[in-house]
Regions:
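SAM cofactor-binding core of SAM-dependent methyltransferases
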Residues: 1-37, 43-47, 53-55
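Class I S-adenosyl-L-methionine
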Residues: 26, 32-42, 51-194
Length: 194
């Protein structure tokens, strides 16, 4: 993924955990034996939890058929609770290793920000258009222990504007899921090295 590519570019070792994408450990994070690594092994930990169940867009399914059943608040709550387990596991891993820097990334509007275990964590808001030429803004929340990061929000003068609008948006068909989930290289480098 994006983080591994930047680490390789910086000539840093990286360890990845993912069920789907190629990874050092291709497994569910819930089953990952992170204690196989010494406590001082990681300088940086990055996690990008799944955002689908935390998305505001899930509300549009309420009262409608989804996956063969009427989607209800109860189903929505159950799905968010399942994803909470993943985020809590990531926080457990961060706490265990206590790296110099840790990062948890999710869209800015994600309901993850409203979960009790996230409310007290420090964060920055960034707009991907300020770190890439991908054509869309994608405001993103990055929780982190990094201090004094110079986060950039779109000033409508970024290189992704056509007139007063961004060239595209994430809702446009044609972008793959991998494209929607990627993190700009310039943002990662800024977070890791500045």
């Amino acid at each position: 993924g994006s983080i591994g590519k930047v680490c390789k570019m910086l000539d840093w070792n990286s360890v990845s955990v993912d069920m789907i994408l190629p990874a050092t450990h291709q497994c569910d994070i819930m089953n990952f034996d992170y204690k196989q690594y010494p406590k001082d092994y990681f300088d940086i930990i990055w996690t990008s939890p799944p955002c689908t169940n935390y998305s505001q867009l899930q509300d549009c399914w309420l009262g409608r058929m989804r996956k063969g059943v009427i989607y209800t608040r109860e189903i929505q709550k159950k799905e968010m609770n399942e994803d909470d387990r993943l985020v809590l596991k990531a926080l457990e891993i961060i706490k265990y290793f206590n790296p110099e820097y840790w990062f948890i990334e999710n869209p800015a509007s994600s309901k993850m920000k409203d979960r009790s275990f996230m409310k007290e964590l420090p964060f920055y808001l960034v707009d991907y258009c300020m770190y890439s030429d991908w054509g869309y803004r994608k405001r993103t929340r990055i929780w982190t222990n990094k201090k004094d990061f110079d986060n950039k929000l779109c000033d409508k003068k970024c290189r992704n504007m056509v007139g007063s609008r961004h060239k595209t948006n994430l809702g446009i068909y044609g972008l793959s899921q991998q494209d929607k989930y990627r993190v700009p290289e310039d943002l990662i480098i800024s977070l890791f090295t500045e």
